[in-house]
Amino acid sequence: MANSTGLNASEVAGSLGLILAAVVEVGALLGNGALLVVVLRTPGLRDALYLAHLCVVDLLAAASIMPLGLLAAPPPGLGRVRLGPAPCRAARFLSAALLPACTLGVAALGLARYRLIVHPLRPGSRPPPVLVLTAVWAAAGLLGALSLLGTPPAPPPAPARCSVLAGGLGPFRPLWALLAFALPALLLLGAYGGIFVVARRAALRPPRPARGSRLHSDSLDSRLSILPPLRPRLPGGKAALAPALAVGQFAACWLPYGCACLAPAARAAEAEAAVTWVAYSAFAAHPFLYGLLQRPVRLALGRLSRRALPGPVRACTPQAWHPRALLQCLQRPPEGPAVGPSEAPEQTPELAGGRSPAYQGPPESSLS
């Protein structure tokens, strides 16, 4: 009885984990696809290339290593696909290359925003985005090549263990963890820390008096009106929101995976499934964190959604109940502007039942 209860509990936990993993997979595909469309159709974004690169990396990961985690890995995966040595090595290479490409891409995006905010008037000091992203992919390729130096994978009858934590890097695993997680974390922390410091200084700076502003009188009422509030608001609160979310999301998703890479192989294998899918959740969180928190992206997404959805049928205004204005309101196409009170046609003497409201009497020549 106890064994059956334990089996049922493990099956329920595996099913819930599989459902959550599938939700993360769908969210990564849909979110990054929608954000990539918005970025490509919005020419005003200054860091559009970094955002598009991050979306492409997330889509590649969601289309390659995440399905392998659902099909080939043990719970929360299905564990029904048995990969041979060559496909398993390819899966290790993709995992060891795409994860650093994602973390280094996030760090490059943070540094680009730091230069745009802190040094907006010095565009010559910014390296070209193509050069930065080329360096990111070169480093990711070298880190992925380290996975080919590990122990060979097991033959197909054994369970598929094709991740980086399953002996894919061998003695190079600590070096891979430092370059793939510690270095991007330090770069991201420095970039968003600088952004927060600059924003907080701007919030603490007193506003400049407007030109032509009237001087306050020295009366008691004027002194009471300019007293500070009893509960002063902490300056820089809004400025701390975006850096805190970016750094917190990076630490929550990637810190467990990096610590597992530095742990012994036995403990890393025990926590492999949990830390792997926590890291994979970053692919689904990036569109909301780096896309929807930007006002230009939200505005562009709203414009695209309004163009895609059919427009609502406009109703007639209550001021346009004149028969001729009502006939025009019913006959015009739905996309036309609504007839307002200033646009309603004037009443004719025939429809008004005699003289028009603007009738002022006979001309002066007839009175003489």
UniProtKB/Swiss-Prot annotation:
Places the protein is found: Cell membrane; Endosome membrane
Protein role: Orphan G-protein coupled receptor. Constitutively activates the G(q/11)/inositol phosphate and the G(s)-alpha/cAMP signaling pathways. Has spontaneous activity for beta-arrestin recruitment. Shows a reciprocal modulation of signaling functions with the melatonin receptor MTNR1B most likely through receptor heteromerization.
Ranges in the topological domain labelled Extracellular: 1-18, 75-91, 151-177, 261-272
Tissue specificity statement from the Swiss-Prot or TrEMBL entry: Expressed in brain; detected in the basal forebrain, frontal cortex, caudate, putamen, thalamus and hippocampus.
Region of interest: Disordered: 332-368
Family: Belongs to the G-protein coupled receptor 1 family.
Gene Ontology CC, one term: endosome membrane
Glycan-bearing residues: 3, 8
Phosphoprotein keyword on record: no
Topology term for the membrane: Multi-pass membrane protein
CDD domains the UniProt entry points to: 7tmA_GPR61_GPR62-like
Protein name according to UniProt: G-protein coupled receptor 62
Oligomeric and partner information: Homodimers. Forms heterodimer with MTNR1B. Interacts with ARRB1 and ARRB2 in a spontaneous and agonist-independent manner; leading to the internalization of GPR62 in the endosomal compartment.
Pfam families membership: 7tm_1 (PF00001)
Domain remark text: Lacks the conserved DRY and BBXXB motifs. The restoration of these motifs affects its constitutive activity.
Membrane listed as a keyword: yes
Keywords: Cell membrane, Endosome, G-protein coupled receptor, Glycoprotein, Membrane, Receptor, Transducer, Transmembrane, Transmembrane helix
One GO BP: G protein-coupled receptor signaling pathway
Cytoplasmic topological domain residue ranges: 40-53, 113-129, 199-239, 294-368
Example of a GO MF term: G protein-coupled receptor activity
Transmembrane segments: 19-39, 54-74, 92-112, 130-150, 178-198, 240-260, 273-293
Organism expressing this protein natively: Homo sapiens
